[in-house]
Amino acid sequence: MNNYRNGGNDMLNITKNLEDKKLTVYLEGRLDTTTAPQLEESMKESIGDVSELIMDFEKLEYISSAGLRVLLSCQKIMSKQGSMKVIHVSDLIKEIFEVTGFIDILTIE
């Protein structure tokens, strides 16, 4: 488990579970301009040999454009080597996906 604090009370907890070539990433907290670089670095370290990526947003409270950029980067990589889906998306984050068009780019369950 990786914890990243961004100065104040805002924090992003990243927990990864790798089974065979299936990586599940659990995010808790806020994915914003401060925490997105840590997620991006964490994903670069983990995604290389993965054929299935699952992003679990059950405990994600917020996502900014910087977080969306990280998701897009992961989606581009996974479209070449396997599949990616986002699960347990809150209504607020689903609305952000709809407004930005990410609802049509990502597989959301």
Question: Language model features by range: what are they?
Answer:
Residues 33-105:
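Amphipathic alpha-helical interaction surfaces in cytosolic regulatory modules
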Residues 107-109:
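Short acidic-hydrophobic, aromatic-tinged amphipathic segments that line or gate anion-handling sites
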Residues 6-7, 104:
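Intrinsically disordered and other compositionally biased segments
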Residues 4, 10-39:
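STAS-typified acidic loop motif
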Residues 5-6, 96:
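Intrinsically disordered, low-complexity repeat segments enriched in small/polar residues
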